């Protein structure tokens, strides 16, 4: 009879629970700060829902009521220059990160009103969610696309799971550029089952990237319970099979989340990343708007009431009372101050017509229709002063005969010598003395550490490339066959093409995507396609297709200088 041998994963997976001693040892000032931030989120979201009912929110209102501790506890450990992103439900994460960036180190909410910077953060986020021009993205992003680079908010994404590879890319850039920092991708139980999530986690583990994959497991993807979506509902269980740590915590307990986040940062500092945190929490309301899930019949009022009995704000109040840190008078004072900040923001964003008490948006706050195309492409100012020459500008004795593939290798190697931010990513780029087409031959000889092999995960590593570009690298990503662009189509179309436009412009997206087109090679229809039309469908891309070595050198040099994403379509018949 065959012998059965139990196998164990190479990485741990565990749950962190807080104790009474943990609460006693926590700093009183920290607990009060975290409590006030949870209260701010609650009042902020209530105001957004009021405005949504009044027809004043231009777009959805994905409220985070019930999930306040999951956000505040996570942000309590992060620094301003640590990077975060999120999904469609990110008001609570973004608001906390913004407030932390503006809160003085000695601020005491029981003694002081909000500073001007704190007020401005509340106001500008509310404006953005309402689609108004004083928002962080000029109203372009709205509720689901929020960004403020100065506060470490790299951008939220409405494509479920689309943001997760980006965070791995931020971390990759930090690692290559020798910057200290943590990147965090926030997402829910729904995105945890996306293929892009698995791909990003695997790449992050492969390169030990300093990134935390933070899952707010609120049990529901719109109306679908996690039990209806996966047999293994414990999301952090996925980590050990990829070789990194998974931590589970009580997402309704502010201190439990803080400790899990602190533990994750310690692991990254001492052992390398990534880490997954699964914060088990609950969204009190429906997917969007102010109704409950039970109003739509996909869960019961009894279930909702059971979770509300563990309200994170009420739990914190009970602990603060038990510890003698605060009582009803202090809670009232905190509530008054955060409510005043929210109310002040709302008053700046609305008005009433003469003789009416119906709120409306002042005309001056609507974005200008003339700005609708801003950010689709850059203005090309990065080419100011650049010299462009055609082959006719050279004498015959100034030119050298060269194969197309050799020119490709040479131009990349020379560019990498001049620019330390250029990296190469793709499948097999580190083998065959230059990858499958010889493109990386010189790069491997000169800068082998900047040529990064990727698994067969085009959508995942294309998303990583986008994150890396947003954090200061100029990545060159290779798609081995043009047909594989359709595997990466989400990141090509919804990610790279739209990222600058949906956040209101103002930053570069320096990506070069090399695409090999290989007809007439006998590989059949799935390896012979030309995807140029795919890029043409999405105007955030520039597309070039050189046919000789001279044009390749010039166009690749331009692509590597461009602040727009450039697709370089290479027909192997010219190699």
Predicted regions, residues:
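Conserved acidic/glycine
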Residues: 1-70, 76, 285-287, 291-447
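Cofactor-binding active-site loop characterized by glycine-rich and histidine/acidic residues
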Residues: 46-49, 54-207, 225-231, 236-243, ...
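Glycine-rich loop at the start of a catalytic domain that most often binds anionic cofactors/ligands
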Residues: 64, 72-79, 96-105, 435-447, ...
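Short acidic, glycine/serine/threonine-rich loops at helix termini
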Residues: 75, 95-100, 158, 195-199, ...
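General beta-strand structural signal in soluble alpha/beta enzymes
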Residues: 84-87, 137-139, 168, 185, ...
């Amino acid at each position: 009879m065959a012998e059965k041998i139990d196998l164990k994963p190479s990485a741990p997976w565990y749950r962190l629970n807080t104790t009474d001693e943990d609460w006693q040892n926590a700093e009183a000032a920290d607990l009060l700060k975290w409590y006030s931030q949870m209260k701010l989120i609650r009042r902020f979201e209530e105001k957004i829902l009021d405005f949504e009912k009044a027809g004043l929110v231009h777009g959805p209102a994905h409220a985070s009521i019930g999930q306040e501790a999951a956000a505040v506890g996570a942000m309590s450990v992060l620094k301003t220059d640590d990077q975060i992103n999120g999904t469609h439900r990110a008001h609570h994460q973004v608001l906390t990160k913004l407030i932390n960036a503006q809160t003085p180190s000695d601020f005491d909410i029981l003694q002081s009103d909000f500073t001007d910077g704190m007020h401005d953060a509340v106001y500008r986020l509310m404006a953005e969610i309402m689609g108004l021009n004083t928002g962080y993205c000029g109203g372009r992003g709205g509720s689901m696309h929020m960004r403020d680079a100065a506060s470490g908010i790299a951008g939220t994404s409405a494509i479920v799971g689309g943001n997760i590879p980006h965070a791995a890319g931020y971390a990759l850039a930090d690692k290559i550029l020798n910057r200290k920092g943590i990147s965090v991708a926030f997402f829910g139980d729904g995105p945890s089952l996306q293929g892009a999530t698995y791909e990003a986690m695997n790449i992050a583990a492969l390169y030990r990237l300093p990134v935390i994959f933070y899952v707010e497991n609120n049990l529901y993807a719109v109306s679908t319970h996690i039990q209806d979506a996966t047999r293994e509902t414990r999301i952090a269980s996925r980590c050990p099979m990829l070789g990194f740590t998974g931590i589970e915590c009580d997402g309704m307990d502010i201190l439990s989340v803080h400790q899990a986040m602190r533990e994750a940062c310690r692991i990254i500092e001492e052992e390398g990343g990534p880490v997954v945190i699964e914060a088990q929490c609950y969204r009190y309301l429906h997917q969007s708007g102010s109704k409950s899930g039970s109003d739509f019949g996909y869960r019961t009022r009894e279930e909702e009431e059971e979770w509300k009995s563990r309200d994170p704000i009420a739990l914190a109040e009970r602990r603060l009372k038990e510890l003698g840190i605060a009582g009803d008078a202090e809670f009232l004072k905190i509530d008054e101050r955060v409510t005043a900040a929210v109310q002040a923001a709302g008053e700046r964003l609305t008005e009433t017509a003469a003789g009416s008490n119906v709120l409306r948006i002042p005309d001056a706050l609507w974005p200008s229709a003339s700005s609708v195309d801003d950010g689709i492409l850059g203005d090309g100012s990065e080419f100011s002063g650049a010299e462009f020459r055609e082959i006719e500008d050279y004498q015959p004795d100034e030119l050298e005969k060269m194969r197309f593939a050799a020119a490709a290798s040479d131009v990349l190697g020379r560019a990498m010598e001049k620019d330390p931010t250029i990296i190469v990513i793709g499948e097999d780029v580190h083998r065959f003395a230059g990858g499958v087409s010889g493109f990386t031959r010189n790069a491997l000889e000169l800068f082998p550490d900047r040529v990064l092999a990727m698994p067969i995960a085009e959508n995942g590593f294309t998303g990583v490339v986008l994150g890396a570009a947003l954090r200061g690298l100029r990545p060159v990503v290779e798609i081995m066959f043009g047909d594989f662009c359709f595997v990466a189509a989400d990141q090509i179309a919804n990610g790279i093409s739209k990222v600058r436009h949906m956040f209101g412009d103002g930053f570069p997206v320096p990506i070069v995507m090399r695409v090999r087109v290989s007809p007439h090679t006998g590989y059949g229809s799935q390896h012979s396609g030309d995807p140029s039309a795919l890029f043409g469908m999405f105007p955030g891309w520039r597309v070039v297709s050189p046919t000789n070595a001279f044009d390749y050198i010039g166009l690749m040099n331009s692509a590597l200088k461009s602040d727009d994403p450039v697709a370089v379509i290479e027909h192997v018949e010219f190699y």
